[in-house]
Amino acid sequence: MFTDRKANSLKAKRQQQPWPKGKPFKILSLDGGGIKGIYTAHLLRQCEQNLADGKPLASYFDMIAGTSTGGIIALGLGLGRTTEEIVSFYETDGRRIFPPYPASLLGKAWRFVTSFFRPLLNHEELEAALKRRFEDDTLGQAGPRIVVPAFMMPKTEIAVF
């Protein structure tokens, strides 16, 4: 999953999936918000439990898209993780990946100013946690289509995975 994006280009690796015929195309869209993704994860877990048919939540969708923390959840669902595993990810790794917001006005101002020059998150902690959870999984192994837009720092380049 963590390879050179240029060498592993989307056009070279993308596999066409059939368009569902005779039924609506269902998309689950998940927004960002850092550690607040734990709320989304809990809500999705409740939805999966309420369905009570034993099927994973991802099997109900043709595409799962997510930005930022929503992208992490989209990857988890698309690569076959249960909603319980996704909740566990946030409970176990969330505090290391998503630093707390500063309480003081000066701290908030500093965070705002520095956000223009560097990422708000510690990418090493995020990458280590994702490697632990996804190991050698690839997007090609996903059940539904997965869409995760990203902003590549410091090149200010947009990428869609």
Annotated model-derived regions:
Residues 11, 102-104, 155:
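Terminal, contiguous helix-loop blocks that mediate binding/assembly
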Residues 18-19, 50:
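A generic N-terminal leader/anchor concept
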Residues 1-18, 24-25, 62, 86-87, ...:
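Non-catalytic, mobile gating and regulatory segments of ester bond hydrolases
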